Amino acid sequence: MSFVKKKFHPISRYYNYLFPIAAFLLPLICLPFLSASQKNYSYFIFSIISAVGWFFSIGLREKQLKMAAGQLLQTKIRKIVEKDEGLRKICESVEERQYESQQLRSQNQKLLNQLLHVRSVFMKTKADTQRMEGAIAHLREENQCLQLQLDALSQECREKEEEAQQLNRELADALAYQQVLNEEYQATFTEQHNMLDVRQVYIGKLESKVQDLMCEIRNLLQLESNMVDSFPRQATVNSQEQPKQLLSELKKIAFKVENAEAASSLTASRYIRSESSVHNYSLECRQLFDNLREESLGMLFVYAPQSQRAVFANSLFKTWTGYGVEDFLNAGGDIVISGLPQWETDLRLLDRKERSGKIIIKTKNHGQIPFYYCLTILNKGPLHNHVLGVLYPVRIDAFRG
């Protein structure tokens, strides 16, 4: 019996639903068997609406019954609890525990909501952190690149600074050198200005001296004509004394040259650095050459043994021989046809002693003519270590006609 009750009791609970279900399914079952003219949907629609209303009313009734049963149960429990002190305390404790459980559940829900919020914030923060880490890594790479560029620029800047310092030092040296040059140029300009003043004075003296020399030349020409007439006769009588006389006259001329007023030094560089001297070396040599041109002793010349060339010769070389002094000294046996070895040896004056001798020269216009020569060394003056020499024909009448 209990088994039957246990099995059929749940089924009996839903007996109220049997009629609406049958009312709903019966038209559906009979619908295929009806003809087209007999198909009337009004019954079908009515059955559906009535079934729906029945379901609604049944559900509402069950809900009311459940609420009434619950209230009745609560009332009975409350009465039982009120009668029994132990149960009342248990109920109170249960209610407290339920309240606490409800509070804990609400707190748990709040914490769960907060946890979800924190989790969402954490996930968002984590995403932001990852994004920031990526940005930091990118910035770190850019920083490394910028650091490398900065190191390169710093190295280049140091090199430029060193180069600038080097250029500054070179500029300072150049400015110092330029200052020294300016001072030297200023001193040279002052000295050259003084030299020009001295030259102007000397030119003025030369102009007055030229006028005097013109008069002397006319007198010398007259004396030369007299000497041409008288000297040959004296030469034939005293032919052995003529070289000695030439050497004596040559020594007088050498004495004048050695003791002429010269510069304090024999080089142009020393002359420029001298402050007390105002005479130019070349100007003094020119003055000496002008004085030597006034001498009428014979073919007078000045020879430099080191350079093996003549630095001066008067015009008688061209007049008597027809050759210039360079042609005469360099032609060798073509012009000096006799006494050439002794002449070349004596011309060097290795022992710095006077020399005299005789050579035969082949002139252009007068044939072969013998000449006496005398040589002496200049020991001081602007032309020191130069050879002063003179050549004079044995017979001066060979040039007449």
Swiss-Prot record:
Signal peptide: none annotated. It holds the Pfam family PAS_12. This is UPF0242 protein CCA_01002. Belongs to the UPF0242 family.
